[in-house]
Amino acid sequence: MSTPSQAEVRRMVAAAGTIVVKVGSSSLTQPSGHLDPDKLDALAAALAQIRLMGGRVVLVSSGAIAAGFGPLGFDERPADVATQQATAAVGQGLLMARYETAFGRFGIRVGQILITAEDTIRATQYRNVERTLDRLLDLGVVPIINENDSLASNEIRFGDNDRLSALVANLVRAEALVLLTDVDALYTAPPSQPGSRRVEYVPNVIDALGDIQVSGSGSKVGTGGMVTKLEAARVAAVSGIPTVLTCASNAGPAMMGDPVGTVFAPVKARGSSRRLWIGFAADPRGAIVVDAGAGQAIRGGRASLLATGALEVHGDFSAGDPVWIDAESGEHLARGLAGFDSEEIPQMLGRNTAQLKRFLGPQYAHPLIHRDNLVLV
């Protein structure tokens, strides 16, 4: 597809029938860590206007841990996982209660969906998420999505809601993604540095990633920084979805296509939602190293990974977990969902289908990774 102009991309955003908006913890809280009712109400009002004009709106909202640590007596976000998860369990209810009240003023119902990355890398759970979101939107509900911080493990998790929002945008076939943060736009360097310039338009986020100096986590109450937002914009771009990055106070103008923040152009036509989730939803748990012939077949697309072309297996994973497919050089060729547990694969290495069936049984005469569960990188 040809690269659209900035004005064209902003018109795409303004015309979006379905829009996904992500808001970070720091955009919803006071410096003390408590929820800021005024900020939350202002965001709800902006989203409600889009909904009342006939738009379909999905909100991906951080803030459960930030909402919970104040009421539990902590001065700042807890560092250990167990306390974070307990805090999220308290804070998620407080957060949703505020959203229900805020949207209720406009006669709009909200629905909570808590997701873990592990939920979404298996086909059945993935389809359940897709069906639930579609039905909520059909009913005029604003779905409010968050990673299930109370249950997600550090081993398999999104780690931030930026990436989750981009995946959700593809899942609901959104026409725009809006990332709301505590800065008004992307800058060429941290805004406090002399010479830093605001970037109004990014025609190709993939090419631009190496040209912009960004920092890590942006605040004491959130987990993401500008790096994760650029990654989200990249995921959206390769899904054919334009993205706007700006501060929460610009939510309304951003969704209306006004020249605020930074706008990122899509770089591809929309692809398969399922394959995008495999490619980006969760970090791989291990790797299967393949020989040159298998690598060439994988690169050609639409080829399953057969045991006959596999040389080594690394990591500890279960059937259905995401894994890398690596060349002998260590280059990542693809990501896919393993068809077998890591402990089963060594006995399968180098064997063809007939040998697997004869020596190990018919249950092993299947690909290590089926082509429908494989995505090139």
Curated annotation (Swiss-Prot):
- Gene3D superfamilies to which the protein is assigned, alphabetical: Acetylglutamate kinase-like (3.40.1160.10), PUA domain (2.30.130.10)
Question: What positions does the entry give for ATP binding?
Answer: 22, 181-182, 223-229
Q: Which InterPro entries match?
A: AceGlu_kinase-like_sf, Asp/Glu/Uridylate_kinase, G5K_ProB, Glu/AcGlu_kinase, Glu_5kinase, Glu_5kinase/COase_Synthase, Glutamate_5-kinase_CS, PUA
Q: Which residues bind substrate?
A: 62, 149, 161
Q: Does the keyword Mitochondrion apply?
A: no
Query: What role does it play?
Result: Catalyzes the transfer of a phosphate group to glutamate to form L-glutamate 5-phosphate.
Q: Where are the transmembrane segments?
A: none
Q: What class of enzyme is it?
A: transferase
Tell me the pathway. Amino-acid biosynthesis; L-proline biosynthesis; L-glutamate 5-semialdehyde from L-glutamate: step 1/2
Q: Name one GO cellular component term.
A: cytosol
Gene coding for it: proB
Q: Name one GO biological process term.
A: L-proline biosynthetic process
Q: What species does this protein belong to?
A: Bifidobacterium longum subsp. infantis (strain ATCC 15697 / DSM 20088 / JCM 1222 / NCTC 11817 / S12)
Q: Which GO terms describe its molecular function?
A: ATP binding; glutamate 5-kinase activity; RNA binding
- This protein's source sits in the domain of life called Bacteria
SUPFAM superfamilies named in the record:
Carbamate kinase-like, PUA domain-like
Query: Is the keyword Kinase in the record?
Result: yes
Subcellular localization: Cytoplasm
| Annotated keywords | Amino-acid biosynthesis, ATP-binding, Cytoplasm, Kinase, Nucleotide-binding, Proline biosynthesis, Transferase
- Any idea what this protein is called? Glutamate 5-kinase
Under catalytic activity, the entry for this protein gives:
L-glutamate + ATP = L-glutamyl 5-phosphate + ADP
**What region holds the PUA domain?**
285-363
EC number(s) recorded for this UniProt protein: 2.7.2.11
- Family membership noted in the UniProt record: Belongs to the glutamate 5-kinase family.
